[in-house]
Amino acid sequence: MKRKTIDIITLGCSKNLVDSEQLMRQLEEAGYDVTHDSEKPTGEIAVINTCGFIGDAKEESINMILEFAQEKEEGNLEKLFVMGCLSERYLKELAIEIPQVDKFYGKFNWKGLLQDLGKAYHEELHIERTLTTPKHYAYLKISEGCDRKCSYCAIPIITGRHVSRPIEEILDEVRYLVSNGVKEFQVIAQELTYYGVDLYKKQMLPELIERISEIPGVEWIRLHYAYPAHFPEELFRVMRERDNVCKYMDIALQHISDNMLQRMRRHVTKKETYRLIEQFRKEVPGIHLRTTLMVGHPGETEGDFEELKEFVRKVRFDRMGAFTYSEEEGTYAAANYEDSIPQELKQARLDELMAIQQGISTELSASKVGQKMKVIIDRIEGEYYIGRTEFDSPEVDPEVLIRCEGDNLMIGNFYQVQVIDSDEFDLFGEII
């Protein structure tokens, strides 16, 4: 009997990607062939793992569902299922509006999906995944949900309260992934620094990272999505002392004006934010900081925005992203503030802020010319090997381009590279 093929389409963040990888492993065990992120149906069944964070993400998810619903109507697909954050948040409404979908599931209801396919969920496979990333790196999700109640954010509504995974379970997953060739781990959570508070009654991120770093075969550990309030200072020591913990921190600061931080319900002040950045750079020499900022939140004055621009100029972040405020139903901001800043002004502020960062990024990249750096090779594109340094996370950060001239480099291996040139985003290097 011919094995059926299931297409898994993943939208949104890396946390969603981990969910898809776990589901793919279960489906393979159930006897299906599985593909990932096909633009058109390649099999009999499709599962779309949606994002519902902000307006643009919701629109992308709905458009993808409609495209596959049309394919089903045209006879190119037998079954269509939808899961993930958008489905969790609007399950009943979506089921009414898009009847071509056979069933919508909440974010965590994989067992229900497998059951409806007539298959069993294998508990013994709970730490196993079918990686969609290059085999040398993986995302490592250490918790679900978030207990922070930032004014603008719908994540706690969608995913619920913070739930930490047990340390031993995470370590077992790391060992499993290392045994399958993974060398580099992007440690992710909605809020890293809260890890352990629910389970162990104290912040346990420093201990967790230290224990991961002790596992043979773990070459790089990179941390994503920290929160500035109540930052666990013991982590500075771990990052400084452990060579395989990258000198890199992704910490979403959102704003610097005390007025905006209070309206955003961030529980941190301008003074505390500057102090934390100073601590990072003092305690972990050479650290590269990535942050995310928001413009256009209700109540943001020209003065607030000027403070934000001055903050970016003064701190000179190594990596920075920014986005405009999007009103999300059910949030504190939607209930208590009027979304009164015109979209045109939000976009103008975003463009102005990113232009400042663009100049900073160009200067910081140029300052690396002449340096020798450890680089991991991710792929080949045309006449270049494409790699990254410890200061660069996949998908979101700059890359290192090495011309394919006589050097037979292996994907997933580390090499010493001398930087010979740079542009606004990327570095150019040659093997030493």
UniProtKB/Swiss-Prot annotation:
Listed GO biological process terms: tRNA modification
InterPro entries listed in its UniProt record: Elp3/MiaA/NifB-like_rSAM, Methylthiotransferase, Methylthiotransferase_CS, Methylthiotransferase_N, Methylthiotransferase_N_sf, NA-bd_OB-fold, Ribosomal_uS12_MeSTrfase_RimO, rSAM
GO molecular function, one term: protein methylthiotransferase activity
Domain Radical SAM core intervals: 132-363
Cofactor(s) the protein needs: [4Fe-4S] cluster
Domain MTTase N-terminal, first and last residues per copy: 4-122
Domain called TRAM: residue spans: 366-432
Residues at which [4Fe-4S] cluster 1 binds: C13, C51, C85
Main location: cytoplasm
Subcellular localization: Cytoplasm
Similarity field: Belongs to the methylthiotransferase family. RimO subfamily.
NCBIfam families named in the record: 30S ribosomal protein S12 methylthiotransferase RimO (TIGR01125), MiaB/RimO family radical SAM methylthiotransferase (TIGR00089)
Name of the protein described by the UniProt record: Ribosomal protein uS12 methylthiotransferase RimO
Lineage, uppermost ranks: Bacteria, Pseudomonadati, Bacteroidota, Bacteroidia, Bacteroidales
